[in-house]
Amino acid sequence: MSRTVFCEHFQKEAEGLDFQLYPGELGERIFNHISKDAWAEWQKKQTMLINEKRLNMMDPTDREFLEKQMTAFLFEGKAPEIEGYTPPES
């Protein structure tokens, strides 16, 4: 049986994550307030950020940058700026 959460990203009830995917308090907040769809959308943005900015996940500074981008995207509705990317027109 799937969990339902009020997704802070989409501002609606949606299917929640199956388990906590990120450590610590932030991970708990994501688990309780972010839907599977919002998390999947973030993973696409995260991959683009890592590739375009050539982030090294072994570097604490790069991990901190990515965490700030994730928080802004999931909870504040701020899309990350990715150089050279033009979103498709609806």
Curated annotation (Swiss-Prot):
Gene3D superfamilies the UniProt entry points to: Fe(II) trafficking protein YggX (1.10.3880.10)
A Pfam family annotated for this UniProt entry: Iron_traffic
GO process terms (BP): cellular response to oxidative stress
One GO CC annotation: cytosol
Similarity-based family: Belongs to the Fe(2+)-trafficking protein family.
One term of GO molecular function: iron ion binding
Organism: Idiomarina loihiensis (strain ATCC BAA-735 / DSM 15497 / L2-TR)
Name of the molecule in the record: Probable Fe(2+)-trafficking protein
InterPro entries linked: Fe_traffick_prot_YggX, Fe_traffick_prot_YggX_sf
Entry keywords, A to Z: Iron
Biological role stated in the UniProt entry: Could be a mediator in iron transactions between iron acquisition and iron-requiring processes, such as synthesis and/or repair of Fe-S clusters in biosynthetic enzymes.
